[in-house]
């Protein structure tokens, strides 16, 4: 075996090292001099950080830094032009807003509510990264913001097919991101809002309502505010979803990333009290193919059950008899008007709860454990306890085999997701 590739980079003030790990090799990063951060998290001098194959990383310094990389990289270069100052200014404006609202609350004996910021823009402009940076800066300032992710295709809080929220109490791990402790999660069950618009809107409104209810008695979370990530669908019905989400979450700041027409349209549509800002995307953002997106979804599901290299999880596999659970899905085929009795109105087929019978077709699909029940008719707007993966269906024994984070099922109502995953149990 040959010696591993070693590269050293000297970064000047306000510069950024961007690198991509190779297809089959990890890269070890070390800060050997100066100060640097990765997506808003400070990195420790002389500590080694192991990034897995295919990682895309940006190391920024406000002062100067010397970075050493060990391992094969697909690319590695220093960029002198970055939007980090813009992101810092956005954070500073949010913090100033928090302080003003604290002062106003003291004078009128009210409960202060922090700023609520919505990040919008097309695919591959870096919305998830910016949300991570802003959350990290808020935490470093002593705040506890709520990270909301409405991107059902590439969710950063829970599994694909979810809308979810997380109270951020510590900065993200440099390699693994935020700890996903006790998130609020709703199972949408699709990787694009277009697959069931009525359900998508119903769920993000339910999520907003749940957050508002929970932070009513949590002063720190309420003052920390919200940083809301969205999907990359910005035209037609996707645009309408953005406007409705802004209203549902009562946002007062909207950041538009790299889309001037969207900025113009929103400036005419949103209320005057909403502060709208257009910012450029980072030059380090790369276009992702459909294949890469699919692979990322698979890695996200794998992480949900098995954790990461630094934080392993050990899920359970066990059999569940058909007659001990109720399987259902949300949404049904629309019946034509001609098939309905005279005078009967068409109900919303997109939010109809349908009982499904166990069959081999559900193998490899995710199911959520609903906090609601069919009997109480509240499955539609109930959050979930968690998820399981159907690994086998035995029609003779009338059992399903599931992969589950717990050794027992937390709910007998399981809600179907179109998201699938082949559990190869490959350690990553």
Curated annotation (Swiss-Prot):
InterPro entries (UniProt xref) = Clp1, Clp1/Grc3, Clp1_C, Clp1_C_sf, Clp1_N, Clp1_N_sf, CLP1_P, P-loop_NTPase
Q: Which PANTHER family match?
A: CLEAVAGE/POLYADENYLATION FACTOR IA SUBUNIT CLP1P, POLYRIBONUCLEOTIDE 5'-HYDROXYL-KINASE CLP1
Q: Which GO terms describe its cellular component?
A: mRNA cleavage factor complex; nucleus
What's the family? Belongs to the Clp1 family. Clp1 subfamily.
Q: Which organism is it from?
A: Caenorhabditis briggsae
Q: Supply the name of the protein.
A: Protein clpf-1
Q: Where in the cell is it found?
A: Nucleus
HAMAP family reported for this sequence: Clp1
Q: What is its main location?
A: nucleus
Question: What residues does ATP bind to?
Answer: 16, 56, 124-129
Functional description taken from the UniProt entry: Required for endonucleolytic cleavage during polyadenylation-dependent pre-mRNA 3'-end formation.
